[in-house]
Amino acid sequence: MTQSNPLIPALLTDKVAIVTGASRGLGAQIAEQIAAAGARVCVNYLSSEDAADQVVADIIAAGGQAFAYQADVSDLAQMQALAAEVVARYGRIDILVNNALPSYQFNPSADYTSIETVKWAHFSQQLDGIVKGAVNSVQAVLPQMKTQKMGKIINISTNLVYNPVVTYYDYTTAKSALIGLTRNLAAELGQYGIRVNLLAGGLLQTTDASRLTTEEVFDYIATTTPLRQATSVADFANSVLLMASDLSLAITGQSIAVDGGLTMP
């Protein structure tokens, strides 16, 4: 269940957004808050159809517009079909949020937290879902954004790339690659009015992926963060809303930590 925020301003009226991996957790929260700000939203999902339909139902019940679309971000043709459907329904694509993440558990005792036990298969799965997924999604929406001469692309990463409090080798390596991707995209696509930024979240309290995280880890985050609390899913989604809006038109190519000041890169 997402966290409600009745105070979201109408920053995205008449905008059209795609949020990948939006059937639950952070993606669902982002989709709902973007919709609450006035955007029409495509809720992308891989396999959780019922959950995606519920996100859409929640958006519509709150007075927004949305539809769910099944597509694997690691398949370019599927993402191109998704983009075509969005344009057919809504006429444009203004915002892409690259949030999709392969199935993952933030378990500090897992074998992918040590260089001695992590396997290349762990890296491959994360690189395929995170980096390839983001590249495919950008390539799918790019023709429409170039035609419009505007667009916002927001890549979702983690503050673990700056401060590996827990050494999730596979996940952090893939998320680190998004920084380079973000900068290259911003450098090339700025001439078309397309802004590309990255938001690096802390360990969010709480999502499906972080449910195995111990209270000791959350307590450590709270005591070492200037704001003395872990970042909530709703707070992170509000940062996405800011970057998706016209309030951030002068910002591109940036990697911004959204973690209450825990990391200051």
Where are the predicted features?
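Conserved mid-core segment of classical short-chain dehydrogenase/reductases
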Residues: 80, 102-124, 167-170, 210-213
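Alpha-helical segment proximal to the catalytic Tyr-Lys
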Residues: 143, 187-188, 249
